[in-house]
Amino acid sequence: MNLKKLLTSAVLSISLCQSAFAAPVEIDKVIGIVNQGVILKSEVDTIVNRVKKQAEEQSQELPKDETLRVQAVERLVNQTLMMQMAERMGLEISDSQLDQTLASMAKEQGGSIADLRRTIEGSGESFQAYREEIRKEITTQQVMRANVDRRVYVSEQEVDNLLKIMESQGQNAEEYDIGHILIDIPSDASADEIASAKTRADKVIELLNDEQEFKRIAISSSSGSQALEGGQLGWMGINEMPSLFAEAVKGKKQGAIIGPLRSGAGFHIIKVQDVRGRQVVETTETRSRHILIKPSIILSEEKARSMLAGFVKDLRADKADFAKLAKEYSEDPGSALKGGEYDWADPTSYVPAFRDTLLSLKQNEISEPFRSQFGWHIVQLLDTRVADKTEQAKRNRAHGMLFNRKFKEESFNWQQEMREQAHVEIFPIDE
């Protein structure tokens, strides 16, 4: 018996049991199967309602609900695949780690978690559901980082070449606010399928040239990861964009429609929504130290977390020395011999779980145990400073630009490969 029949039988059995008492009422409905998991109609409705509410607040025109539901289903398929990957990796986001992330989010808005709760509940959304959605977002980010990072390599020669380009650009470098629409093509597409996709891409450009609203067209037509956000990629410099985009965007004026640009993923359409001079932003660097414990067959998740919790208790009571504990117990070979210490670095270079925890700390404060894709950590913030403009800082920035460019390209390839290897069935949603 396949999964769809099994689910149908289960729903039918419940209905028959209830029929002796009252007419059955449909509480929810399975609208998709992703490997051994399911997508529920209620999950689709939640995303659609959130997009519609945001559009209403911004006075933005949206396509029909049917189109929004298709995009919501696509997002849930990708999210489900990554959550399944997280389960296979043994990756879980603890409540304490989630609370630290929520505290950082609330702090950015000038408030506390209690203030954030009031805002969420004031919008008509359950705070518990919001917490779980953030937990999923953190999880999928860490899954992607763990799987895509190892596919990205930046050579010293590439860094040298980019530094020369940046030097020649001087202060004249520009940043572009980019909108993006992807008309995707399957990896094994036939000539007819490619021609059909090209025709659709040309039609989209035609609509945009007629000054149709970009976000609405992106939501209704794009297969890109930001489709439900209206295809908004945000501000980026030429050196931060995927190579295909950079060559086409350079020198374009505000309002320019570019494309279709062909890649292995499909046909890309870009709109230059605005142009500005590069914003010089001073970044804050941190110096920190940490201890990493990796769960294993011998050491369970709970024992690893409990072990670090004991370290934290002793450290706060001045009964232990951080450097000695790191040298003896930490399983991060790069820092253990140095007493767990990380030299000055931009915290955004760390994985999200580590970054968010570090940024939530005060100087010399030690965190509670938290989980990343590498294992369980505790971290202490030793000091902060405004990044200097040394040659090494420039080199680090160039490396970061190249890494981010390649990461964006590879993350799409990885998601496409994962989707093609999965068993996905989508059923009609009857309204």
Curated annotation (Swiss-Prot):
Coiled coil: none annotated. Keywords: Chaperone, Isomerase, Periplasm, Repeat, Rotamase, Signal. GO terms for biological process: Gram-negative-bacterium-type cell outer membrane assembly; protein folding; protein stabilization. GO terms for cellular component: outer membrane-bounded periplasmic space. It catalyses: [protein]-peptidylproline (omega=180) = [protein]-peptidylproline (omega=0). Its main location: periplasm. InterPro entries: OMP_Chaperone_SurA, PPIase_dom_sf, PPIase_PpiC, PPIase_SurA, SurA_N, Trigger_fact/SurA_dom_sf. Its EC number is 5.2.1.8. This is Chaperone SurA. It comes from Pseudoalteromonas translucida (strain TAC 125). The lineage of its organism: Bacteria, Pseudomonadati, Pseudomonadota, Gammaproteobacteria, Alteromonadales.
